[in-house]
Amino acid sequence: MTSSQDACYISLLGLAEYFRTSSPPNIKKCIQCLQALFTFKPPLKVEARTHLQLGQILMAYTKNTDLARNHLEQAWMLSENINNFDDVKFDTASLLAQLYQQQEQSSLAKPVLRKAIELSQHNVYWHCKLLFQLAQTHATDKEYALASELLAVGVESTDETNATYLKTLFLLSRAMIMMIERKTGDVLTILNQAGTMIDNAVQNIHLKEYLKVFFYVLQVCHYLQLGQVKTVKTSLKQLQQSIQTIMAPNWPADEQIFGQSNTEMFMWLPKEQLYVLVYLVTVSHSMMAGYMDKAQKYTEKALTQIEKLKSQENKPILAVFQIILLEHIIMCRLVMGNKSLAIKEIALAKDVCLSSSNKFLLKKHSAQLHCLLGLYAMSASYFEHAERQFFACINDTTERDLKLFANLNLAIVYLRMKREQELRQILDQVQQENSQCSNSQALMGSFYYVQGLNAFHKSSFHEAKRFLRETLKMANAEDLNRLTSCSLVLLSHVFLSIGNSKESMNMVTPAMQLASKIPDIHVQLWGSAILKDLHRMLKEPALETEAYNNHCNFSQNLIADQMKCTKFPEHTLISWVQGDPPLPMLSQEILEAPPAATIQQQSATVVRLSGQPGQQVIYQ
């Protein structure tokens, strides 16, 4: 460029920046200034950089993604083969790949990222950033083996530069992918390797603490995935201690910590989001352990924190956290007999999913929404609706635990509908699948419970006792309180049915104690009915009257709540089984409530551990 062209170029750049930073920004004039640069036929480097700048501006300030894409594609084509032009070249590749993904064209993003990775081997920062991004792209497309391979390449590439922090980040990210793949043995091996590095090799105390949080989140999720609620307690306490350290007032800002060197600029999640995530895994643990009050308390705190963060900057990951928290709190409401709140929150979860970019969350969570609607319909004795919702869930998901959970609840629906052939098919299918792969201890305990419930309904009392003792053994080993209370109350009913009042009382008493602690209104309803019969058999009229009054109170509360929720427009969501959920629902006909007499004692359902948090984020 001549000196006069140089001056024009600098002036136009200055003007563009002036218009961009004006209050309010004048993006149209900013873009016009940048486009005017092309009239001077600038050198390739200047042309490529200008196309990148236009792409950045268009993506950040406008909805004209097609024009942004055009500029970024030109920037990539021009810069791809220019030496000593790393920032423009790799920034372009990264941004273009992001845009392709936004347009749901990850097949175009992958070759761009692969080429950029190949060209960036001399630049540790960009090489690692692009490896993370491509791994994330494959993980989003559920190509977990490819994502894992790329993260393994990242581990190897950091060996050459002795970047210990970055190596640990790659290891933990790979462990996360393997958790999704259910490679239990490999997860433990990698977590142990990463844990040793965090303790002995990472010198920076601030980076060490962030890695600890990442490590403990994965460890806690791993144990919860296996249904090991008791085993996880130590790791959960350590996680809570680490997050308290990071959130302390004297802890430096993220910007001060992640910027000391190129290999330390990578962050899994900022501390405010980690804070929400720790609440989330604590809620998950409380749910599985059967502490609904605790789960509710932590959910409310987490949702408050999410709203606070949204008011500052509405990051997509916050909606992911919100939807998983809502999934948990909805199950709490159903266990506690509060269907009217549950259906309102299901509708809220649906709205959160619909409001996400390109309905991304709806695609990820439609199966969970159907499952929650199935549980809601089941608890309200709308069994045909529950059946359709569980089928929709099973057809929508590839997640093994969610399929198993939906099938177990579907089995209870068939049991209540006296459809023995379909029930037998489900139980045989679950049995066959369980022989081929390991499942969550909580879910397998639930499977034995459903078999025990089935045997009880067939009056096969000896077989029912055998299944329920197996359930109790698994539940007691890991402090699965809700599973324990459900099993004890059913076992009590078994003993009552064979006339063994002493053993029946020995079972129902701890069942009621646990149920009031959870609290689980369905077990309390069932247990109070058993106690009424037991006290009548034992000729204890005062205690019989007390048990009868308790039973009436539980029953009336459930009936009143059901009458209330069936009048809500949100109740019609139980008819949604395919496509996008309806919006709005106010004009839709409200389904009539079934007779109150259909609320039966054996309405206990199984509680699901929701999809594990953090799986959607490898690098941000």
From Swiss-Prot:
A single GO BP: cell division
Keyword set includes Phosphoprotein: no
SUPFAM superfamilies: TPR-like (SSF48452)
Primary localisation category: nucleus
Coiled-coil regions listed: none
InterPro entries in the cross-refs: MAU2, TPR-like_helical_dom_sf
Keyword set includes Transmembrane: no
Superkingdom of origin: Eukaryota
Keyword vocabulary terms for this entry: Cell cycle, Cell division, Chromosome partition, Mitosis, Nucleus, Repeat, TPR repeat
Record localization: Nucleus, Nucleoplasm
Residue spans of the TPR repeats: 90-123, 445-478, 485-518
Family membership noted in the UniProt record: Belongs to the SCC4/mau-2 family.
PANTHER family linked to this entry: MAU2 CHROMATID COHESION FACTOR HOMOLOG
Function: Required for association of the cohesin complex with chromatin during interphase. Plays a role in sister chromatid cohesion and normal progression through prometaphase.
Quaternary structure (record): Component of the cohesin loading complex.
Protein name, per record: MAU2 chromatid cohesion factor homolog
Source organism: Aedes aegypti
Lineage, opening ranks: Eukaryota, Metazoa, Ecdysozoa, Arthropoda, Hexapoda
